[in-house]
Structures are given as structure tokens and as C-alpha cells.
Amino acid sequence: MIELFTADTPNGWKISIMLEEINFDYKISKVNLSEGEQHKPEFKKISPFNKIPVITDHENNKSVFESGAILMYLGEKSNMFYPEDNRLEINQWLMAQMGLIGPMIGQHHQFHYYHPVSYTHLTLPTICSV
């Protein structure tokens, strides 16, 4: 059985979706980020950067952190969505999502929904004089 340590974030959702698609038995353990549960010593043992998601595969007692690494692990383990002959292309797009697309969307959401500030009143000369 796979245990998924997660929270309600896009990276956490990716793993839940994959686990559903590959039809693996899994248990969800919610990590309360606002209460700092990700900083507890027992969590740091499985997630050295104190981030979610993380899985523990109780069949072999291995833990995997980082959403991309987890997706690759589950793809290999299930023999689904990660065929050997397409892994180069899959890995390229996965890394692009993790390193470029995902963070940019995250920044957009952070500033658009949680810290909205209008900059429309600033003109180019005002911006350049700062």
C-alpha cells in the first residue's frame, strides 16, 4: 500500500490523480501546512525539504519526495503512463512543467488570489524611475 502525505495544493493533487488512474490502494495522510506539520522531525525523515507531496511505499518501505519523482516512481511501478520508449520525451515535458510552467502558474495564483495589488496606475516612466 502507498501512503500519500499531502495537502490541498496542485502538487498534492497530481499524485492523487495518478494513484486513482493506476488503481493502486493508497491511504491519504493530510499534512496541515498552516500549522507547520511539515516541519516536524518525523516528517523531515521522509521529506528532507519539508515539502509535500511525499509517498511511502509500504511494500518496500521506500519514501519518495518531489511530485515529478513520485510520478516517475508510480509510472514505473504500475507499468502505466511511463513507457520506456517514450521516457525521454515524458521526462522533458515533466521537467518543463516542474521547473517552468508549474512555478509560473503558482506565482500567478499567489499574487492574483492571495496578494492582489493593482499596478495599472503605474506608467512606464514611473516604473523606470524606481
Model-derived regions: residue spans:
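Single conserved hydrophobic/aromatic residue that forms the stacking wall/gate
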Residues: 121-130
